[in-house]
Design a protein with these regions (language model features):
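Conserved C-terminal "switch" segment of AAA+ ATPases
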Residues: 1-87, 96-105
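C-terminal engagement/docking regions of AAA+ P-loop ATPases
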Residues: 61-162
Length: 162
């Protein structure tokens, strides 16, 4: 519910929304709820395409005591690194894409009154937010994500997903 609440801070009923989505949903509020659910679902999806980093952790009890290492790998996903700032960036990207689409419609002489923010803008913004970041997340962020996931131990290595 946290991500949906944050999306809801930035996606409000006073924004121009895709008219077809509002009509299909039956109301502006219902359209926003569906858009937010789709964006949050994409942000937190745990699929091969949303893998963001692979961490190898040594969870042996005493490091350096001669005990054999107990190595395990953990895939971290985009959602593991989501924050309020990331969600705001996603919404800002979606807004810019919708504005650009509206300007293109106006330039082409088309009726742009039905053009507004839609699910497609949000889903593309989720994808772009993480694909534009070419570097792996900083080690403290990776350690925090592992801790939140309940993984304990010494971080041995971090690699991009394959």
């Amino acid at each position: 519910a946290g991500a949906a609440e944050i999306f809801g801070l930035y996606l409000t009923e006073d924004l121009p929304l895709d008219a077809a989505e509002v009509a299909a949903a039956g109301s502006t509020r219902a359209a926003l709820t569906a858009m937010i659910a789709a964006a949050a679902g994409q942000l937190y999806a745990r699929t091969p395409s949303t893998a963001y980093a692979v961490a190898t952790v040594d969870s042996s009890m005493v490091v350096g005591s001669g005990a054999s290492a107990n190595l395990s790998t953990h895939t971290l996903y985009r959602g593991d690194f989501a924050s309020g700032a990331v969600i705001r960036n996603i919404v800002d990207r979606a807004k810019k894409a919708a504005i650009k689409e509206q300007l293109q419609a106006l330039t082409a002489g088309a009726d742009a009154s039905s053009v507004g923010i839609g699910t497609r803008h949000l889903l593309e913004a989720v994808r772009a937010e993480f694909e534009d970041q070419v570097d792996l997340p900083p080690l403290p962020d990776i350690e925090d994500a592992l801790t939140v996931a309940g993984v304990r131990g010494r971080l041995v290595s971090v690699e991009p997903p394959r």
